[in-house]
């Protein structure tokens, strides 16, 4: 690979900087093994940016992201900044504006039960034994969260509140294509989630997804009502590959997928726009209670890097190398404290070193 790539690195707050350090160790191993020309630039975001620049998303950070091929994001927030007005707090003042600025309309949340971690899965042992590897593809900018009209009116017994579920054809088409393209990189199956037996928006959703499916004859398509999907995820999550969801349904199902893995420290997330530009981050929070103690699990941040390589840099071999290295570490019983259950645990730094070494060795 001879192309030059540039990544904007935004470590953020809490455990963000220390887990980001581990991801950059792994990136260095990827650079060397695959002869990739990747440079990075660091920028403040969230609480760190408030402390250093007086605002959670400084113009220099936005400009740096604009000049990059992708953004590797840590985590933001913490008690230190909770006294600020909501729009000036790290989460709402940084992450949401970044998503809006770069028109990040799709969210990809993988949820995988790794071999050796079945005991952390809250499902029955016989179900957990089958394992699962699911990718939830959620539409981020349409649906009931943004549809108009919305509001409250009236008083007394006549007081009411209302929201409107609205989806346009182009919004459904583009998120469906993201799901089908993702399935092509995985096990070639898409399950589209809707409520087409009740909602007009879901009827349109199903019609358009069926149309897009004709462009992907190599991908199997199934439809499932949201209420059934929530049950099937508990009954047999191994049946799913890619879940295609509207904003509301994806909000619900992606969290359910996360919970059945048993550890938020293992879950990455990607938010993409139509040009393939993406923001990649762990699904968990900044965990200020363990920040600076060298005990945080860096795997979600490292897996976020793998998603970045796969979806924004089209470097699937490098992404797969990271995933294999993580699998090897877990198979060998290497655990940070959140997964140790009383057994010997490695530190944040040690886990990063081990995964980077395994990438370099090509395990």
Swiss-Prot record:
It catalyses: (2R,3S)-3-isopropylmalate + NAD(+) = 4-methyl-2-oxopentanoate + CO2 + NADH. Its EC number is 1.1.1.85. It holds the Pfam family Iso_dh. Substrate binds at residues 99, 109, 138, 227. The record marks 145, 195 as: Important for catalysis. Pathway: Amino-acid biosynthesis; L-leucine biosynthesis; L-leucine from 3-methyl-2-oxobutanoate: step 3/4. Keywords: Amino-acid biosynthesis, Branched-chain amino acid biosynthesis, Cytoplasm, Leucine biosynthesis, Magnesium, Manganese, Metal-binding, NAD, Oxidoreductase. The keyword RNA-binding does not apply. Its main location: cytoplasm. Binds 1 Mg(2+) or Mn(2+) ion per subunit. Mg(2+) binds at residues 227, 251, 255. Disulfide bonds: none annotated. SMART domains: Iso_dh. GO terms for biological process: L-leucine biosynthetic process. It is found in: Cytoplasm. NAD(+) binds at residues 78-91, 285-297. GO terms for cellular component: cytosol. HAMAP family: LeuB_type1 (MF_01033). Catalyzes the oxidation of 3-carboxy-2-hydroxy-4-methylpentanoate (3-isopropylmalate) to 3-carboxy-4-methyl-2-oxopentanoate. The product decarboxylates to 4-methyl-2 oxopentanoate. Homodimer. This is 3-isopropylmalate dehydrogenase. The gene is leuB.
